[in-house]
Amino acid sequence: MATKKETKIEEKKVEDINLPKDIFEVPMNVDLLHQVVVSQMANRRTVIADARGRGDVRGGGIKPWKQKGTGRARQGSRRSPIWIGGGVTHGPTNERIFKKVLPKNIKRKGLFVALSEKYRNNDIKIIDSLELKEIKTKGMIETLKKLEIKGSCLIVLPKVDNNLILSTRNIPKVSTIQAKDINCLDVVTAKTILIDKEGVKVIKETFKK
């Protein structure tokens, strides 16, 4: 069983938190981690590029000039790709699918590898509770300063906490996620992982069925 000292916000006794060894002490596997991260990045990708083909551009309803007798090359439509303003041949379309499907056990193992690496690098902070009585961004910034959090931070919550979510919404590089939805990509991209004690239990119950 892995142990981690609870990070205190106020002056009170610091406790040792027992962390599941099979979640927070998994050996590093670079290939597996890369596979899961690339898959999740691809699944979040938004397809923007969409070139217009000859069937999408304006004009071309009439033959530009007659077939013979002009001395010029024959043309059938102004929408031809060889004309300025014509359609694009073999251009990118928004019908492309980048989604990559991985087995659940692979995604789960990737998450455990990512959490374990954060644990080994002391980039995981466990706190007793992060519940806020009111929506206050300034108060949340002060709390993060007390916890000595620098850079990007992922706050893992055991359940939806609207006060906390709204308080962190305008803080740069700080994001929140429910423990049941935690994933490898979000863990890897954050510098520090801040987990509520109850959040650890939710992670164990969700991913170690």
Where are these regions (language model features)?
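Glycine/serine-rich anion-binding loops at beta->alpha junctions
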Residues: 54-91
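A polyanion-binding, active-site-adjacent surface
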Residues: 39, 43-56, 60-63, 75, ...
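Extended polybasic, low-complexity segments that bind anionic RNA or targeting/receptor surfaces
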Residues: 1-46, 93-209
